[in-house]
Regions:
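NAD(P)H-binding glycine-rich loop region in Rossmannoid oxidoreductase-like domains
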Residues: 60-64, 68-127
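A short, basic/flexible loop-to-alpha-helix module at the beginning of a structural domain
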Residues: 3-27
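A structural signal for isolated positions on well-ordered beta-strands in alpha/beta enzyme cores
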Residues: 52-54, 81, 146
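Conserved Rossmann-fold NAD(P)-dependent oxidoreductase catalytic core, especially the SDR/UDP-sugar
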Residues: 105, 109, 114-180
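Short, well-ordered alpha-helices that flank and scaffold nucleotide-derived cofactor binding pockets
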Residues: 44, 48, 71, 134, ...
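Juxtamembrane interfacial secondary-structure elements that flank transmembrane helices
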Residues: 55-57, 61-65, 154-163
Length: 180
């Protein structure tokens, strides 16, 4: 499914500002789900900060999916390396992790038409995170792991959002109406 979400090269006022956050630019940083919404912005922030990014994507040969990352890399001081990675295949991130000091895990299934939420979303997200963390255990250079999530984990059928001040969802909010 092609996402219509804004990408970092689109005309959109959003940025990942890494100023003040200690990032060792001498070691690569791996980003899973680098073609996704959050992964793309994190990749852009790292490249803008001069970091070498090992971007794990489903298929680095799919030029339509990685074109925006290549455009960002052309204009940033950092260096981009694309790697194939499959959330559900153990060991598929090992090559991308090699030599990295930080792993930022943003990859997760995001499907709008879900037939079986446990099978289609929860199980692959858990297995994918386990696979990434198992890779970290095998990679001595990794000293930090950042796990991310999405508004999709908290925002279900929009009932909960009505009670939040200004209908703004923050880290203090939790989805109490959705279920599997």
């Amino acid at each position: 499914m092609q996402s219509s979400a804004a990408r970092p090269t689109d005309d959109f006022d959003f940025a990942v500002d890494l100023r003040g956050i200690p990032v060792d630019t001498s070691n690569p940083v791996m980003v899973t789900g680098a073609t996704g919404y959050l992964g793309s912005w994190i990749t852009k922030g790292l490249l803008d900060a001069g970091v070498t990014v090992h971007a794990a994507v489903r298929d680095p040969r799919n030029t339509s999916k990685v074109a925006h990352l290549n455009r960002i890399a052309e204009q940033a001081p950092g260096t981009l390396h694309l790697f194939a990675g499959d959330l559900l295949r153990p060991g598929s991130y090992d090559q991308a992790m090699e030599g990295c000091s930080i792993v930022i895990h943003t990859a997760s299934p995001f499907i709008r038409a879900v037939a079986d939420p446990q099978r289609d979303l929860v199980a692959p997200a858990l297995q994918g995170t386990r696979n990434v963390l198992a890779g970290v255990e095998r990679t001595p250079s990794v000293t930090r792991v950042v796990l991310t999530s999405s508004i999709a984990a908290m925002y279900g059928d929009a009932v909960d959002i009505r009670r939040y001040p200004g209908r703004i969802v923050t880290e203090t909010c939790w989805n109490t109406t959705s279920s599997l």
